[in-house]
């Protein structure tokens, strides 16, 4: 995958596209089937906007924040299930995270900057596959799995293999176990000096 930081441009470079606002995962799957490869997903939009500003063409933009299932955090069978469109801020303040993964909530408050935490999504952070993004290493440490869905069905991929998978679909959620003995911390003091 391409590093998002390499994209540059202005709003005048954004070509025309059709915007779709589905309200269910089934509707997203129907749209992707209809469009073939002529679509792009957008959740928080931080990376997608940079790609569009760089002139990357897209015919159909599928906005995912209108799908409730992608914006939820819930406990399912001793696992925390986080929808792909949950923002970093919503994740760090969610009662299920604060109660069951306090250290993780504290670490999440240190990710990126406030703009990234407010707008950026868990799924976007993972799928961007950028070495400078922090979610993937945290979810690797948690032995998380990623849930995908398309018109043919649903499947899970270990978070370790998400960026290597050849089977693409809609990332619906990230799921990780509750209550083991892991302790999380983040040290931002070792930033490179310029």
Model regions: which residues?
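C-terminal structural segment of proteins
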Residues: 1-194
